[in-house]
Regions:
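Core catalytic alpha/beta fold that binds nucleotide/phospho-ligands
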Residues: 1-115
């Protein structure tokens, strides 16, 4: 059963501008694993940060609660398996909500344009 569908899009340049202006934004929004992954992308890192930001926003739209209930962006971890397929791992309040609502499988697709 599909619990919900969420879609989000953001301009990569917007994420780049915010991150260059406020280093705390990165640490508040992204997990250590996401930061490590994106930082390996050198010239294209902001594209990868933007894709993860949008995936987190899309997930919250799919759940239908918005950012209430104390869920933090960093409670949502976007990672890749050994084949490069993206997945979502929930922790903290996001996991509590998922467990309460009874959804365990989350599908995600990431897209971005070159900056």
């Amino acid at each position: 059963m599909i619990y919900g569908t969420g879609i989000d899009i953001i301009e990569c340049a917007r994420i780049q501008k915010v991150m260059e202006r406020d280093i705390g934004f990165r640490d508040k929004i992204f997990t250590e694993g996401e930061i490590a992954y994106c930082e390996t992308k050198n010239r294209n890192k902001y594209q990868h940060y933007a894709a993860r930001f949008s995936a987190k926003e899309a997930l919250m739209k799919a759940i239908g609660t918005g950012w209430r209930f104390g869920i933090r962006f960093a409670d949502i971890d976007i990672y890749h398996d050994e084949l490069g397929q993206p997945h979502i791992r929930l922790t903290g309040k996001a996991k509590e909500l998922a467990d309460k609502e009874g959804f365990s499988k989350i599908h995600v697709s990431l897209s971005h344009v070159k900056v």
